[in-house]
Amino acid sequence: MSNELDGSNKNKEVERVLLNVIDTLQDSQKGFATIGEHLTEDKLRRFFLAESLKRANFRAELENELHRAGMADVSETGTVSGALHRAWGELKSKLGGDDHTLLETAEQGEDEAKKAYKDALEHDLPLPLRQLLTEQQSHVLASHDFVKANRDALVTK
């Protein structure tokens, strides 16, 4: 990929797009871990902790692409809205948030992840990067649907 990105103004755009997705993945990784620790159903706990690891892997893949292209050093902070979202989820769990409430919070976070990937894929990106983002997006969409379905299932119990 580095040959496709060397020395153009397009580099800055690609870098900005990737950093936005990476920040969102950082938020997702932390959010899944935090919420996963507070869920009561074992199936959901396992899913959330595995999903946290998956988001860390996605982030590492994108960071590697940036490093290979000689671009940015990536922060470990995530976004401000992600930090607020995690804090809200933590507060809900401490105040007696049940699994349904925690899954609602997780779904909101997944909506942000879906948006980050959609926005990224609207840009002119090198084909290998577009393919990587498309594969990751597919997983994020499936994860969102899983979280939503489990949230909805808890309403009917």
What role is predicted for each listed range?
Residues 21, 28, 35, 58, ...:
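Amphipathic alpha-helices that form helix-helix packing interfaces
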